[in-house]
């Protein structure tokens, strides 16, 4: 029988993993089962890996932080919901067809509204990506994030991530329980972009409502419309059509490997 992404990633949450490890008091940071394996990053985050990864597909790590894309509320409604309710596996499973274009590894960094994202979360994201980027089996990264501070997080990561591999941020304006929720398509397009060779070396990008924006330039321009982001001064970088990127612009500012910023030894910002 086919194994869904939720079964691969969501069946065992990071909380359950850590509890199991504490109970067993195991000195081994890597464990396996018939369907999945997982290991810990240096910061203690659990990376869940399907044992059914396809060798002919690129591999994308999805780092979930919460936000509206993981929100839940009254069925059909786009307001009065609680952010950060769904875990990373459930999010990936909602993006129909995504396992046909990439192997997905799930990492639950936190599960909060973006107003509650801290500089410690920023540093954890940067250092986790920098660590995992050394794995030749991982081709790109996607971060799911709340929209209120997504542009701030993308700016920070654009300066502190040290890899040429694609790093894509996305979110949603409607919670998962809303009619025509926008999160699944945003996530699908983001994973497709992160898995694409054309996206290498372009810095941190934001994908929203099929648009591709530079992490340094993107701004939130609406609190209600699904087309909620734009790059007013420099313009967008491109757009997505059914998982295929079309670029017409590039980042002109120093980013990622070109910057002098190093947060590897920090736990909080000065």
Enumerate the predicted regions with their spans.
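Bacterial N-terminal signal peptides
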Residues: 3-11
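Sec-dependent signal peptide cleavage junction
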Residues: 10-23
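ATP/NTP phosphate-donor binding region
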Residues: 34-131
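Accessory alpha-helical/coil subdomains and C-terminal extensions
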Residues: 63, 87, 94-98, 214-270
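Short beta-strand segments
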Residues: 63-65, 143-145, 168-171, 205-209
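Short Gly/Thr/Asp-enriched flexible loops that form oxyanion-binding sites at enzyme active sites
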Residues: 143-165
């Amino acid at each position: 029988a086919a194994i869904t992404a939720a079964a691969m990633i969501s069946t065992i949450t990071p909380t359950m993993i850590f509890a199991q490890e504490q109970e067993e008091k195991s000195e081994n940071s890597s464990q396996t089962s018939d369907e999945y394996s997982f290991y810990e990053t240096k910061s203690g985050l659990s990376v869940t890996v399907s044992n059914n990864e396809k060798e002919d597909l690129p591999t994308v790590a999805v780092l979930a932080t919460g936000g509206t894309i993981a929100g839940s509320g009254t069925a059909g409604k786009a307001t009065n919901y609680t952010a950060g309710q769904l875990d990373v596996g459930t999010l990936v499973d909602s993006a129909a067809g995504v396992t046909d274009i990439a192997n997905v590894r799930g990492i639950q960094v936190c599960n909060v509204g973006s107003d509650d994202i801290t500089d410690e979360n920023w540093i954890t994201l940067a250092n986790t990506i920098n660590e995992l980027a050394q794995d030749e089996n991982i081709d790109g990264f996607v971060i799911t994030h709340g929209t209120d501070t997504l542009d701030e997080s993308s700016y920070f990561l654009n300066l502190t991530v040290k890899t040429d591999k694609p790093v894509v941020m996305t979110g949603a304006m409607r919670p998962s329980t809303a009619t025509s929720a926008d999160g699944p398509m945003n996530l699908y397009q983001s994973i497709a972009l992160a898995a694409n060779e054309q996206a290498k070396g372009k810095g941190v990008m934001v994908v929203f409502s099929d648009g591709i924006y530079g992490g340094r330039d993107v701004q939130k321009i609406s609190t209600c419309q699904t087309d909620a982001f734009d790059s007013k001064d420099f313009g967008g970088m491109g757009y997505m059509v059914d998982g295929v990127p079309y670029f017409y612009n590039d980042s002109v500012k120093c980013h990622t490997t070109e910057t002098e910023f190093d947060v590897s030894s920090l736990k909080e910002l000065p």
